[in-house]
Swiss-Prot record:
It is a peripheral membrane protein. It comes from Oryctolagus cuniculus. One of its GO terms (molecular function) is glycerol-3-phosphate O-acyltransferase activity. The HXXXXD motif is essential for acyltransferase activity and may constitute the binding site for the phosphate moiety of the glycerol-3-phosphate. It is an enzyme of class 2 (transferase). Its EC number is 2.3.1.42. It is found in: Peroxisome membrane. Keywords: Acetylation, Acyltransferase, Membrane, Peroxisome, Phosphoprotein, Transferase. This is Dihydroxyacetone phosphate acyltransferase. Dihydroxyacetonephosphate acyltransferase catalyzing the first step in the biosynthesis of plasmalogens, a subset of phospholipids that differ from other glycerolipids by having an alkyl chain attached through a vinyl ether linkage at the sn-1 position of the glycerol backbone, and which unique physical properties have an impact on various aspects of cell signaling and membrane biology. GO terms for cellular component: cell junction; mitochondrial membrane; peroxisomal membrane; peroxisome. It catalyses: dihydroxyacetone phosphate + an acyl-CoA = a 1-acylglycerone 3-phosphate + CoA; dihydroxyacetone phosphate + hexadecanoyl-CoA = 1-hexadecanoylglycerone 3-phosphate + CoA.
Length: 679
């Protein structure tokens, strides 16, 4: 049930008006223990590790085959024969020409998984990881559950995506634990890397185009290729729900294409079940942090190349702290579909005939994608640094070390109360922990004479590679702060809603919360139609931390709650400020129509001027990630209209709706009870 008809959720009675009234309760999750796999690697020869006896446990229903057999199976499948026949009639191309095209697509796409390549990467990655990471921590209980799952049913691995390292990390870990290495969906960009592209292909990568452009034959070949590997139980299939690396450390909204494909064999009764395994990969320090800041500031992403990889060797002399890889419980697709989706519609048509996805099926795929992402988020590890940097950003440019330590420890308690997966070495003095993480991130902050100072200048020059150094540092800091928002977003939205609501009537606060959740649903992961539960979770966490009390009618702020609310509002304020500034830009936009590229360039110029003039201190607005998310939200809210013209999308501003949104975000007009999606 969605939130729009939920007034009865807030009418739970109590004779005592000061009593806390909540329908939501949440037990604190207990996570598995971590083991550092590098500890053993440091005492055993890398060559011995790479050449070890490797006999992985496999799926009980496996059909043994070579990579070339999979290609032949796809080429000769009923589905591809049917699609070729249909396209031949539509395009008047001969069947032989189309069949030749299928062979070319398969040659471009398919992996050539070989044990020799796996052993090479095991040797190389073991050396590299020991050089740049203190630890690579894995929950071995999760590995044991995965081991059982792989033998029972086809498995799909769904890791979070923050770094290029993610790509081969799971292959390295599964090889380490004698599990079958996965076949991995990779972008075509990697094929441009001489030798490396082929090495990746031999380590299990299969390549997909970023866009299929309505190419029916390509889609048919790609989906049949993935389904063939899944049906045969050839190897676990791995792909990233986010589709690309998150440059901002916030989980990106999911892509649904590959998830739809891997679900199909179950719905067509070709497999009894399929396990989906959410995997959370967390970094103390992200290898590409500076590169990401450049990209967010508008510098084009460097093309993947072998030369670029060789230039990146300098990172081998740096310390990136620890990596944490948490394997979540395998989730049965059969259980998810039980009572929710019927498989009978698939019985009405022969399996080889492609079917258009029904609305019900699309809704189900969407729900599963968001569920998997929320499970990933739940198991993402927070190191002390995101807490430290969140405090620093609210007290920039510098802070007394003792004050920073005190505030960070206060935030540590709040993070744990909110159920955050915080790894904090309690056996070490707190000041040493904070000092260690400042040193680890010495490119961003430094400790000078009891003052912790953000590095906002670069020697004699304020400009580096055409970018203002201060902007690079602050966007890098924002990336780490964003890790906190994964668990703080719901209580933060309640805090901002309280600030926006004159009087603290529960239903008015809820209306403001619903409005904010709707506006920012491209920035954060919310389960579709779960607004009430999200509101209750936010309120529950604020009650649990003794920030608020709830009566049947009102939300009351406690005496100690003001400090928590002030911090949460400060944590979320950059996003509200960004969207307000982008509304102001749109109202000044002189062009009647514009493309996304024109919008990004003009917004960058407009916001840079505001910051240079001191008219705003909101550096997050420089992020192309925020700018793109805001544009998507504005289209969804009817603030901007989007049309397709000559294979490109053009946008135009709805001025009254934009003005209204800007005023609502700035609390100039009340939200009102019917906070509908369209403004």
């Amino acid at each position: 049930m969605d939130s729009s008809s939920s007034s009865n959720y807030f009418s739970v009675g109590s004779t005592n008006p000061s009593a806390v009234v909540l329908l939501y309760s949440k037990e604190l999750k207990k996570w598995d223990e971590f083991e550092d796999i590098l500890e053993e690697r440091r005492h055993v020869s890398d060559l011995k590790f790479a050449m070890k006896c490797y006999t992985p446990l496999v799926y009980k229903g496996i059909t043994p085959c070579k990579p070339s057999d999979i290609k032949n199976s796809v080429l000769n499948s009923e589905e591809i024969h049917y699609v070729i026949k249909q396209l031949s009639m539509e395009s008047l191309q001969s069947v032989d020409v189309l069949r030749e095209e299928v062979c070319e697509i398969l040659d471009e796409m398919s992996h050539k998984l070989r044990l020799g390549a796996i052993r090479f990467f095991a040797f190389a990655l073991s050396k590299i990881f020991k050089q740049i990471f203190s630890k690579v921590c894995v929950n071995e209980e999760g590995i044991q559950k995965l081991q059982r799952a792989i033998q029972e049913h086809p498995v799909v691995l769904l890791p979070s995506h923050r770094s290029y390292i993610d790509f081969l990390m799971l292959s390295f870990l599964l090889y380490n634990y004698d599990l079958p290495v996965p076949v991995i969906a990779a972008g075509m960009d990697f094929l441009g890397m001489k030798m490396i592209g082929e090495l990746l292909r031999m380590s299990g990568a299969f390549f997909m185009r970023r866009t299929f452009g309505g190419n029916k034959l390509y889609w048919a070949v790609f989906s049949e290729y993935v389904k063939t590997m899944l049906r045969n139980g050839y190897a676990p299939v791995e792909f990233f729900l986010e589709g690309t690396r998150s440059r901002s450390a916030k989980t990106l909204t999911p892509k649904f294409g590959l998830l739809s494909i891997v679900m199909e064999p179950f719905f067509k009764r070709e497999v009894f079940d399929t396990y989906l395994v959410p995997i959370s990969i967390s970094y103390d320090k992200i290898l590409e942090e500076t590169l990401y800041a450049y990209e967010l500031l508008g510098v084009p992403k460097p093309k993947e190349s072998t030369t670029g990889l060789l230039k990146a060797r300098r990172i081998l002399s740096e310390n990136f702290g620890s990596i944490y890889v948490y394997f979540g419980d395998p989730v049965s697709l059969r259980s998810l579909a039980s009572g929710r989706m019927s498989r009978s519609p698939y019985n009405l048509v022969p399996r080889y005939i492609p079917q258009k996805q029904s609305e019900d099926m699309h809704a189900f795929v969407t729900e599963v994608a968001y569920k998997m992402q929320l499970l990933q988020i739940e198991n993402l590890v927070l190191s002390p640094w995101p807490l430290i940097v969140a405090v620093l950003l609210q007290n920039r440019p510098s802070m007394d070390f003792d004050a920073l330590l005190e505030k960070t420890l206060w935030l540590k308690g709040l993070t744990q109360a909110f159920g955050g997966f915080l790894i904090w070495p309690d056996n070490e003095p707190a000041e040493e922990v904070v000092q260690h993480h400042i040193l680890l991130h010495s490119n961003i902050a430094s400790l000078v004479k009891d003052q912790v100072i953000l590095k906002l200048e670069s020697g004699d020059s304020e400009v580096v590679d055409g970018l203002i150094f201060q902007h690079i540092t602050l966007l890098t800091c924002s990336t780490y702060r964003n890790q906190l928002l994964n668990i703080f977003v719901r209580p933060s939205l309640v805090a901002v809603a309280l600030q926006m609501t004159p009087g603290f009537r529960k239903e008015d606060v809820y209306s403001a919360f619903r409005f904010l959740r709707d506006v920012f649903s491209d920035e954060f992961i919310f389960f579709p139609g779960n607004t009430v539960k999200d509101f209750e979770e936010g309120c529950y966490l604020l009650c649990k931390s003794e920030t608020i009390q709830m009566t049947t009618r009102d939300i009351l702020v406690t005496e100690k709650g003001n400090a928590v609310l002030e911090f949460l509002i400060g944590l979320f304020r950059p996003f509200v400020e960004c969207y307000k500034l982008l509304c102001i830009y749109l109202l000044k936009e002189e062009e009647e129509h514009f493309t996304e590229k024109q919008y990004l360039a003009a917004v960058r110029k407009f916001t840079s001027q505001l910051l240079n003039q001191g008219a705003s201190q909101c550096y997050d607005v420089l992020s192309s990630d925020v700018q793109k998310n805001a544009l998507a939200a504005f289209v969804r809210l009817g603030v901007v209209e989007k049309k397709k013209v000559n294979n490109d999308y053009i946008f135009s501003v709805n001025e009254p709706a934009t003005t209204k949104l800007e005023e609502m975000l700035g609390c100039k007009i009340p939200i009102g009870k019917p906070a509908t999606a369209k403004l």
